[in-house]
C-alpha cells in the first residue's frame, strides 16, 4: 500500500508545532505574499517538485547559489567523492587552499581570503577586521542592504542624517548599534554630509553593490565612485558585500563591473557566499595581505570556526567555480536572463500594467510601479513605493501556473545555466495569463 502523501498545508501545520513559524528562515513562511509555503521534496536542473508532486520552474535557486541548476553532474560527482573521504576533519585540507587560490585568481582586489560557513559570519568578520585595521568603531551601511543577522548590522535608518541606527530586531541592545549609521542608498549628498560629520571616526562603509534584498537595485557609478573617494580621503575601508551578487553577475563579481566603469576602482574588503559554496554552507571574506595579516593566528583580530573550510563544501564550491569559469558561460547566462526580463516586460505592456525590470548575469529583479512612466527604484523608499498588492497577485498567479519566484517583493530572482529558452518562454506565457484582468 502506497504511503499517503502529505500536503503542503499539512506539512506547514506540522512544522509550526516544532519550528518557530514553521520555517528556518523567515521569508520561506510566505508572510509577505500570503498563502501556504511549498515544501520541496526534490529538485533537478531548473525545476523543483513540492511534497504534493507539483513541478515548478525555479527562479529562487536557493536564493542564488544554484547558478548551474540543481544536481549538476560535475558538482554532484565532486560532492560524492569528497563525502566518501570524510565529512569534516577540523584540520586544514588541500582543497580549501585550492578554493582560496581559485577565488583569488578571479578577484584581483583580494590577496588573501578566509573561508567561513555563512554570509552572516563573513560580513560580521569583515566588520571586525575593518575596525581592527583602522582602530575605529563607527560604520556606514545603507537602508535596504542586508548583511546577515549579526547584531551590529540589523539596523534601520534613523530619523535624521546623523542619527545612528535603531535595532530592527528585538534582542539587539541599542548600545550594540550605536556605532552604525544608516544612509540612503544612491544618495551622494547624504553620504558626503555623513563623512563631513563622522569621517575621522569611520572604520568602514559596507555596501551591496547590487542590492538583492531590495529586489534588484544597482549602486550608480557616480555614487560608487564617490564612496571610494571618500573612504580613501578619510582612511575608512570600503567593504563590498558580494554574498549574493558575487560570481552571480559576472565571473569577476560586481566589483569587476565597477572597475570597468571607474579607473583604478577596487574595494578594500570583499565578502562572498552563495555561489562559492554551490549550495553548501560556505562563505568567505578577503582583502590585501596587509589587512588579512591582522587576523589570528597572525594578528590581534580573532576569528575562528569549527566547520570553516569544510571539505565537502569546498569540493562543491570548487566544482561550481570551474564550471562558471568556462568561456562564454556568463554571456549565455546573461542573454537568457535578459530574455526573461524582456519577456516579462512585454507581457506587462500588452496587459497595460506598469512594469520595470533589470538584470545582470544570472540575477534579476522587477517592480510594478504605481504610476506609468516611473523608472527603476534607486533606494529602499522607492522600492517601498511600488505596488506590493500587484506583486503578491502576480506571484500567486505564477505559482499556480508552475513558476516559483521569490515569495517577497524585496528579493531578487535568479536564472541558472539549466534554464532553457523553453523554460523562459513558458514563464513568460504564465506571466501573460497571470497579468490578465
Swiss-Prot record:
Keyword match Nucleotide-binding: no
Main EC class the enzyme belongs to: isomerase
Pfam family, one: Aminotran_3
Catalytic activity of the protein: (S)-4-amino-5-oxopentanoate = 5-aminolevulinate
GO function term, MF aspect, one: glutamate-1-semialdehyde 2,1-aminomutase activity
Cofactor: pyridoxal 5'-phosphate
InterPro entries referenced in this protein's UniProt entry, alphabetically: 4pyrrol_synth_GluAld_NH2Trfase, Aminotrans_3, PyrdxlP-dep_Trfase, PyrdxlP-dep_Trfase_major, PyrdxlP-dep_Trfase_small
Entry-annotated residues carrying N6-(pyridoxal phosphate)lysine: 274
Pathway info: Porphyrin-containing compound metabolism; protoporphyrin-IX biosynthesis; 5-aminolevulinate from L-glutamyl-tRNA(Glu): step 2/2
GO cellular component terms attached to this protein's record: cytoplasm
UniProt-listed HAMAP family: HemL_aminotrans_3
Protein name: Glutamate-1-semialdehyde 2,1-aminomutase
Organism encoding this protein: Leptothrix cholodnii (strain ATCC 51168 / LMG 8142 / SP-6) (Leptothrix discophora (strain SP-6))
Gene encoding the protein: hemL
Amino acid at each position: 500500500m502506497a504511503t499517503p502523501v502529505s500536503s503542503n498545508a499539512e506539512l506547514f501545520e506540522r512544522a509550526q508545532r516544532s519550528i518557530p513559524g514553521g520555517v528556518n528562515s523567515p521569508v520561506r513562511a510566505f508572510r509577505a505574499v500570503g498563502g501556504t509555503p511549498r515544501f520541496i521534496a526534490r529538485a533537478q536542473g531548473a525545476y523543483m517538485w513540492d511534497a504534493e508532486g507539483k513541478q515548478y520552474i525555479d527562479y529562487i535557486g536557493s536564493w542564488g547559489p544554484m547558478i548551474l541548476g540543481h544536481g549538476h553532474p560535475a558538482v554532484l560527482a565532486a560532492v560524492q567523492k569528497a563525502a566518501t573521504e570524510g565529512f569534516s576533519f577540523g584540520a586544514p585540507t588541500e582543497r580549501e587552499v585550492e578554493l582560496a587560490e581559485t577565488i583569488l585568481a578571479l578577484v584581483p582586489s583580494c590577496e588573501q581570503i578566509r573561508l567561513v560557513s555563512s554570509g552572516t559570519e563573513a560580513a560580521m568578520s569583515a566588520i571586525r577586521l575593518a575596525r581592527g585595521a583602522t582602530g575605529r568603531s563607527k560604520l556606514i551601511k545603507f537602508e535596504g542592504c542586508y548583511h546577515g543577522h549579526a547584531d551590529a548590522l540589523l539596523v534601520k535608518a534613523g530619523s535624521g542624517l546623523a542619527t545612528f541606527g535603531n535595532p530592527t530586531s528585538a534582542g539587539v541592545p541599542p548600545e550594540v548599534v550605536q556605532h552604525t549609521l544608516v544612509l540612503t542608498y544612491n544618495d551622494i549628498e547624504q553620504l558626503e554630509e555623513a563623512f563631513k560629520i563622522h569621517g575621522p571616526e569611520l572604520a568602514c562603509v559596507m555596501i551591496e553593490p547590487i542590492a538583492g534584498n531590495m529586489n534588484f537595485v544597482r549602486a550608480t557609478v557616480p555614487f560608487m565612485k564617490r564612496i571610494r573617494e571618500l573612504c580613501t580621503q578619510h582612511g575608512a575601508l570600503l567593504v563590498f558585500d558580494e554574498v549574493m551578487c558575487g560570481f552571480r553577475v559576472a565571473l569577476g563579481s560586481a566589483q569587476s563591473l565597477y572597475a570597468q566603469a571607474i579607473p583604478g576602482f577596487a574595494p578594500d574588503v570583499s565578502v562572498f557566499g552563495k555561489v562559492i559554496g554551490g549550495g553548501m554552507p560556505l562563505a568567505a571574506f578577503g582583502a590585501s595581505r596587509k589587512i588579512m595579516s591582522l587576523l589570528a593566528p597572525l594578528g590581534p583580530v580573532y576569528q575562528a570556526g569549527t566547520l570553516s573550510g569544510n571539505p565537502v563544501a569546498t569540493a562543491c564550491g570548487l566544482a561550481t567555480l570551474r564550471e562558471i569559469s568556462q568561456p562564454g558561460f556568463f554571456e549565455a547566462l546573461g542573454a537568457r536572463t535578459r530574455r526573461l526580463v524582456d519577456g516579462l516586460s512585454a507581457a506587462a505592456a500588452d496587459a497595460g500594467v506598469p512594469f520595470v525590470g533589470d538584470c545582470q548575469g544570472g540575477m534579476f529583479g522587477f517592480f510594478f510601479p504605481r504610476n506609468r512612466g516611473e523608472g527603476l527604484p534607486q533606494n529602499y523608499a522607492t522600492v517601498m513605493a511600488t505596488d506590493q498588492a500587484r506583486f503578491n497577485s502576480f506571484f500567486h498567479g505564477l505559482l499556480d501556473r508552475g513558476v516559483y519566484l521569490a515569495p517577497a517583493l524585496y528579493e531578487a530572482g535568479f536564472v541558472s545555466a539549466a534554464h532553457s529558452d523553453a523554460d523562459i518562454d513558458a514563464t513568460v506565457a504564465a506571466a501573460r495569463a497571470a497579468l490578465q484582468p
